């Protein structure tokens, strides 16, 4: 059995090694940061890539396994070497897409992403690493791709794609890949591709499912042909809200890379006019035919009305971001900050905290004093859940003055579902299915609690 002195010595050595490791990590981050910023950001590449007459000896060796494919051959590889591909979004889809395009020898990759690397990205965004957390995704991706294939020109764009810049940028590239995660950007990229005459390889992934198609190519429909009007903003779920398995984005990103390579090499796409659906849980792929190009399409029809790029956030009624949306369903009087709720909790005042997140999120983390009833149970007026809520209210009421209402505070992850729950509880109280209630939601939810109240509380 080790003596106390040996334990202390080992603890001291571990602390010293951890300090050395942290120092090495800082040096690595500095080195990677220096590598990824060799040039200032340019709005557009300065010149087209020159044509290539032949492959070098090194290129023949590097691409030998795909060169011997009769469908590709030397001619196809030469076309790849002069192709310029614009990738909108360097996240779960854009990372594997860019990785395989660089490996295949595509001449230039434009990398558009205004966001920075976060730890929550690393489970699926495989070009980024821990050492570059907080750095621009476009620069991080460019640095990784240069290490993979130094012959590929990588052009990072760290500003968000906007109606003022999109068309000029798209015109400088041969093929565009939409790897975004929001509806306004999808319409923006589609309209820019139609106006510039560029094919658009589009994919999306959510939870265990994904889909891919090619728009505006070889007489096929554009995005507006299929979706003339955007969906209601409150019906749209992104990866931050609904979650996604990293492997699913990897599969769809690889399929995007395949379509881009076939277009760039002159082989033609598989999914122009069709949509490939992927169900990861069942392991199924299914292809469905899309409607043909609409002659009355606002973008690509015979008499288009979209002749310039417009305000897509206003058109869609939502922000051009993949971040979680912040709903505003309640008045300020019906909401409290996490700081005010913490003050109430510390005072010992009688109240009930209702957590309306799904069970899978409660399994990740929770406040121990909260009653858990998922929002879906409230939406369908689940009898058992309402009984549980009534019992909890009654128990809390025993400590108050007779007849006093027990205030209910509703919390969720971000403060969106909690507002919906407040509305439901108010309607139940108005319909006398519950006793008269004072209900408020906690602004920002548990993520605000983690950021402002308890730094040890898990964020997800």
Swiss-Prot record:
Annotated GO biological process: Mo-molybdopterin cofactor biosynthetic process; molybdopterin cofactor metabolic process; protein urmylation; tRNA thio-modification; tRNA wobble position uridine thiolation; tRNA wobble uridine modification
InterPro entries listed in its UniProt record: MOCS3/Uba4 (IPR028885), Rhodanese-like_dom (IPR001763), Rhodanese-like_dom_sf (IPR036873), ThiF/MoeB/HesA (IPR045886), ThiF_NAD_FAD-bd (IPR000594), Ubiquitin-activating_enz (IPR035985)
Disulfide bond residue pairs: 316-324
SUPFAM superfamilies named among the record's database cross-references: Activating enzymes of the ubiquitin-like proteins (SSF69572)
Effect of residue 109 to V: Found in a patient with molybdenum cofactor deficiency; uncertain significance
Functional description taken from the UniProt entry: Plays a central role in 2-thiolation of mcm(5)S(2)U at tRNA wobble positions of cytosolic tRNA(Lys), tRNA(Glu) and tRNA(Gln). Also essential during biosynthesis of the molybdenum cofactor. Acts by mediating the C-terminal thiocarboxylation of sulfur carriers URM1 and MOCS2A. Its N-terminus first activates URM1 and MOCS2A as acyl-adenylates (-COAMP), then the persulfide sulfur on the catalytic cysteine is transferred to URM1 and MOCS2A to form thiocarboxylation (-COSH) of their C-terminus.
PANTHER family with a match to the protein in the record: ADENYLYLTRANSFERASE AND SULFURTRANSFERASE MOCS3, UBIQUITIN-ACTIVATING ENZYME E1
NCBIfam families the record matches: PRK05690.1
The name this protein goes by in its record: Adenylyltransferase and sulfurtransferase MOCS3
């Amino acid at each position: 059995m080790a003596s106390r002195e040996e334990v202390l010595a080992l603890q001291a050595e571990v602390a010293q090694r951890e300090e050395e490791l942290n120092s090495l990590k800082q040096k690595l981050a500095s080195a990677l940061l220096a590598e990824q910023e060799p040039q200032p950001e340019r709005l557009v590449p300065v010149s087209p890539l020159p044509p290539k007459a032949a492959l070098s000896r090194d290129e023949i060796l590097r691409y030998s396994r795909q060169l011997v494919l009769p469908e590709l051959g030397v001619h196809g590889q030469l076309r790849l070497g002069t192709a310029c591909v614009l990738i909108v979004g360097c996240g779960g889809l854009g990372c594997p897409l860019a990785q395989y395009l660089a490996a295949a020898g595509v001449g230039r990759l434009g990398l558009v992403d205004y966001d920075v690397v976060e730890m929550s990205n690393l489970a699926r965004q495989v070009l980024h690493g821990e050492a570059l957390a907080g750095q621009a995704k476009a620069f991080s991706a460019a640095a990784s791709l240069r290490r993979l294939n130094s012959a590929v020109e990588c052009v990072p764009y760290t500003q968000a794609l906007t109606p003022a810049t999109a068309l000029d940028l798209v015109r400088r590239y041969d093929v565009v890949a939409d790897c975004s995660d929001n509806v306004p950007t999808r319409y923006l990229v589609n309209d820019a591709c139609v106006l510039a005459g560029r094919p658009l390889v589009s994919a999306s992934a959510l939870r265990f499912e994904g889909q891919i198609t090619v728009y505006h190519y070889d007489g096929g429909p554009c995005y507006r042909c299929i979706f003339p009007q955007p969906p209601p903003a409150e019906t749209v779920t992104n990866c931050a809200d609904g979650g996604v398995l990293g492997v699913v984005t990897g599969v769809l990103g690889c399929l995007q890379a395949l379509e881009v390579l076939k277009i760039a090499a002159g082989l033609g796409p598989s999914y122009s006019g069709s949509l490939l659906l992927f169900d990861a849980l069942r392991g199924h792929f299914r292809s469905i035919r899309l409607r043909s190009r609409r002659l009355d399409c606002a973008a690509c029809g015979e008499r288009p009305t979209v002749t310039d790029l417009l305000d897509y956030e206003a058109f869609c009624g939502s922000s051009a971001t993949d971040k979680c949306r912040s709903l505003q369903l309640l008045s300020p009087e019906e909401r409290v900050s996490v700081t005010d709720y913490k003050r109430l909790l510390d005072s010992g005042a009688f109240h009930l905290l209702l957590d309306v997140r799904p069970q899978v999120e409660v399994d990740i983390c929770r406040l121990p004093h909260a009653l858990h009833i998922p929002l879906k149970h409230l939406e369908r007026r689940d009898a058992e859940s309402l009984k549980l809520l009534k019992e909890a209210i009654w128990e809390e009421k025993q400590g108050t003055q007779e007849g006093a209402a027990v205030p209910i505070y509703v919390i969720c992850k971000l403060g969106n579902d909690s507002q919906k729950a407040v509305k439901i509880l108010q309607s139940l109280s108005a319909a006398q299915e519950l006793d008269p209630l004072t209900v408020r939601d906690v602004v920002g939810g548990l993520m605000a609690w983690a950021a402002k109240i308890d730094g040890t509380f898990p964020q997800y």
